Amino acid sequence: MAATAYLLYRLALRVAPRGPAVFGGLAYVCWVAMFDGDGGQTPIFYNVFMVAAAGLAMTVATRDARGNVARGGTAMLLVGCAIQIKYNVIFEGAYFGLAMLWARRSNGAQAIVSTGLLWVVLALLPTALAFSAFAATGHGAAFDYANFVSIFERVADSHARQFKRLITIIGIISPLLFVGYPAIRSRTKTGEALFVLGWLCAAALFFLLFGTYFPHYALPLLLPVAVVAAIGLDRIARPRAVAAAVLGVGAIASVTVSGVNIRSKGDYVTAKRLTAEFNPKDQACPFIFDGNPVLYFLSNSCLPSRFIFPSHLNAVIEAQAIGVDQRLEIRRIMRNRPQLVMTLEPHFVDENPRARATLDAELLAHYRAPTRLPYGKRTALFYRPK
């Protein structure tokens, strides 16, 4: 996150003075927690690749009249690394590529096509290497399903819930959009500023089209929004006062959100207490039906299934998106008599009642009454075989 913020600052320096550029980098740090990024969502790891790619792409698209092929290729390879972490950045990567190709329009159609193909290959190279590694071990079909098919088989949330999440996200990001508005409405934009605004449009378009609107899906938006805010801050009255007020609100909100998360989900002490319930020496792997999968790692336990994220087996939206019936997989796991089964109360709000009923039947037949431990605002239940 620190590296991403620094690269944002360096990128913003190309479109704004030092003070507003510092504001852009700090704004990213302050807003990450508000979008559930303080726990390490995937954008925290791929955003650094994207902001580095953006800097290179901006140079090719705005300063190099003939479009430097090697620099553009490096940008697209960085995009490819980000894509292999998560595919959400495809629209942004496509925008970078098209913007750079536009800079080469005077080179002729043949040069544009050949360069475009090279850049596409570089962007797809990390994914191709990952697929090859899986295919070489006989898991090519599983890679294909998990990466390209399952997302389209998830059950969508209700429109009302999606709309509520969208409004919440807009509210959270609105202070930065307010600061950046002068940059958006300005009639005198440099090539670099236009590039950043185009980047923002590409990121926003994917975010809106993808749907679901969980907070962490807005984390990639923070990159162009922070740079646009830096540009806007340079064009408003009393920029220091505005920057101090916005960053102050952001910092307070960030600390508050992190505190709420700790109270609702627990902290290090909670994790240590829960981990003590696991026995890594037992050959019967534990099964976390509901809870944090990091407990497998912290307890050095074996894994009962390839579906180690609890939502894969307990969430309604994943019921048709994992390639197997949730209930059949739960029964398969329970036939191995896990040394420990962990669930939480109250139940997960989006829990699949049919999956829960399958688990409860197994617990009633083969497991003792549970041990109960506090888990933030919920209670962890640990079942052991009779």
Residue ranges and their predicted role:
Residues 16-19, 53-74, 106, 176-191, ...:
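Membrane-interface transmembrane helices that cradle and orient dolichyl/undecaprenyl
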Residues 91, 208-240:
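Hydrophobic/aromatic-rich transmembrane helices and adjacent perimembrane loops
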Residues 38-46, 215:
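Short acidic/glycine- and proline-prone juxtamembrane loop motifs at membrane-interface regions
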Residues 94, 264-319, 323-353, 376:
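Short periplasmic/luminal acceptor-recognition loop of GT-C membrane glycosyltransferases, typified by
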Residues 5-30, 47, 64-67:
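Transmembrane-helix signature of polytopic, membrane-embedded enzymes
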